């Protein structure tokens, strides 16, 4: 968590500096000093690149921390910005389908940390699932989404009423899947290394 907070703080500083430099570049351009405006603009772009790099490192750190504690059929998106979370879920779904898994629990939270407690992450994930025609259902505690993966010919309806606490294990499908044989740490590392290096922008956090 300390590493995550450190990188987010560094990214925030670079974002502030970038905003200041772009503003000064506009002032210089308005004053007719195009050379100075270009110089300031280039410095601002460098700040933006550093900001993105810090955010990628923060996303990777929090993802590894949260998901190393999850079951193989879960993905925890706490701490990720919206676009980071969407990319992580897309990558995870692709990996699950390749392994022949038939479901995935997506932990999206309840929006308690969002401005005015308005959920932003769940709608973004749901929109992505609907765009890809992937079936899903909300779970009892409202902080999770159960996804029926396309690889499953007959997805098993989960008994949502039996879910008590987030840390309790979920019932497995009646047939075994490759996920049961894959170490959770390997799944987490696969997502973090393949997904987060592709991030380009960062949006509101959940």
Curated annotation (Swiss-Prot):
This protein's GO CC annotations = cytosol; nucleus
Compartments annotated for it: namely: Cytoplasm; Nucleus
Pfam families linked to this entry: DUF1771, Smr
The answer to whether keyword Cell inner membrane applies is no
- One GO MF term: endonuclease activity
All copies of the Smr domain together span: 75-150
PROSITE patterns xref list: SMR
What is the protein name stated in its UniProt record?
Smr domain-containing protein C11H11.03c
Q: What organism does this protein naturally occur in?
A: Schizosaccharomyces pombe (strain 972 / ATCC 24843)
């Amino acid at each position: 968590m300390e590493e995550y907070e450190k990188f987010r703080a560094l990214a925030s500083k670079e974002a502030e500096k970038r905003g200041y430099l772009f503003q000064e570049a506009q002032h210089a351009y308005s004053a007719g000093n195009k050379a100075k405006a270009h110089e300031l603009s280039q410095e601002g772009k460098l700040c933006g690149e550093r900001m993105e790099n810090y955010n990628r490192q923060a996303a990777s750190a929090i993802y590894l921390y949260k998901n190393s504690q999850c079951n193989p059929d879960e993905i925890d998106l706490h701490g990720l910005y919206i676009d980071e979370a969407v990319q992580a879920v897309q990558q995870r779904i692709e990996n699950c389908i390749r392994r022949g898994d038939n479901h995935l629990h997506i932990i999206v939270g309840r929006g308690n940390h969002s401005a005015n407690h308005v959920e932003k992450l769940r709608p973004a994930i749901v929109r992505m699932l609907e765009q890809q025609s992937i079936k899903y259902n909300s779970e009892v505690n409202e902080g999770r989404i159960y996804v029926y993966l396309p690889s499953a010919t007959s997805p098993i309806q989960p008994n949502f009423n039996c879910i008590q606490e987030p840390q309790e294990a979920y019932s497995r499908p009646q047939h075994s899947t490759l996920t049961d044989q894959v170490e959770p740490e390997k799944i987490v590392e696969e997502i973090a290394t393949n997904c987060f290096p592709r991030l380009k922008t960062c949006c509101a956090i959940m």
